[in-house]
């Protein structure tokens, strides 16, 4: 060990430039690898409220178009298409749906101060699908959901900022100028949970879903789906079954057809969603970065040996 340290010290003294590059490069590479691993773990490992990330699949928006000439294309999935493709899928434990978050003005009726919060419309089984920690109250009931009542589950941060306390079950606030009753309060959700995150959750039934389906033969809409797979189910099997169902659906429709070509695992949805991001390209770039430092080290060592022979 002592001899190795002496050799390293002599190498640094004889070739300070290459030694400095080698040390800095090695340190940067180690730090880079640690950051990549940490980001990957935080974004993909099973953590509450997204406790089943490894078993989840995400749908895209899908697309409707006129069969005759592929015109009148619109993105978005409606109730009819969603139920035809994803209801009672073999190998799927549970299915839910939602709409993306939107920044919504919220305030108390007795106050002129308006706050903007991220509000997410969700299905009636949303709080069974994810593991939120309730501080007070409950999720909205099936009756409230079906009756399209203006109720919401809000986060601790929103409750404290809006009301000054978390004891707010039964109280009302204005959500986009609609009186909304608080039925539950959950622990804050970090934005790293891209699907479970929101400041407030309201029933998806409040959305005028049928309006979006009127000009697409009932197929179009605003739903995004989530599937929770059984342990032995492979994503490829689900994709194959969904494709078969899609073919059957389109063979039974008159004017419009629906396409769902976007079914992601959690890792795919998090890092490689969309056609602009190529997984092979990302992996190749990471590999190149990891190989640069060893290449510099070898180059420095070779140059040092050559200088020794010359002298």
Describe the role of every protein-language-model region.
Residues 36-109, 113, 220-224:
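Membrane-proximal extracellular/periplasmic loop immediately following the first transmembrane helix
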Residues 99, 108-146:
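The feature marks short, hydrophobic/small-residue-biased sequence motifs that occur predominantly
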Residues 123-139, 150-274:
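Mid-to-C-terminal secondary-structure elements
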């Amino acid at each position: 060990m002592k001899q190795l340290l002496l050799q390293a010290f002599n190498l640094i003294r004889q070739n300070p430039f290459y030694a400095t590059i080698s040390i800095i490069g090695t340190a940067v590479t180690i730090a880079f690898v640690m950051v990549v691993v940490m980001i990957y773990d935080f974004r993909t490992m099973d953590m509450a409220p997204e406790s089943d990330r490894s078993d989840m699949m995400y749908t895209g928006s899908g697309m409707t178009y006129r069969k005759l000439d592929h015109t009148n294309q619109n993105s978005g999935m409606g109730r009819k298409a969603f139920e035809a493709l994803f209801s009672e899928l073999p190998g799927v434990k549970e299915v839910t749906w939602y709409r993306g978050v939107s920044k919504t003005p919220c305030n108390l009726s007795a106050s002129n101060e308006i706050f903007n919060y991220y509000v997410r419309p969700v299905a009636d089984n949303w709080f069974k699908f994810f593991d939120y920690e309730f501080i007070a109250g409950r999720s909205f009931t099936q009756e409230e959901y079906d009756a399209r009542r203006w109720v919401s589950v809000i986060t601790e941060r929103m409750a404290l900022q809006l009301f000054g306390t978390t004891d707010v079950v039964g109280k009302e606030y204005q959500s986009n100028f609609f009186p909304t009753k608080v039925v539950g309060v959950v622990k804050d959700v970090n934005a790293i949970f891209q699907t479970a995150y929101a400041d407030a959750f309201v029933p998806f039934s409040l959305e005028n879903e049928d309006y979006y389906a009127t000009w697409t033969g009932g197929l179009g809409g605003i739903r995004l789906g989530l599937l929770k797979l059984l342990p032995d189910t492979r994503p490829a099997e689900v994709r194959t079954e969904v494709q078969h169902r899609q073919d059957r659906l389109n063979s039974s429709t008159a004017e419009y057809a629906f396409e769902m070509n976007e079914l992601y695992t959690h890792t795919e949805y998090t890092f490689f969603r969309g056609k602009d991001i190529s997984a092979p390209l990302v992996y190749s770039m990471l590999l190149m970065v990891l190989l640069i430092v060893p290449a510099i080290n070898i180059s420095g060592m070779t140059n040092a040996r050559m200088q020794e022979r010359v002298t």
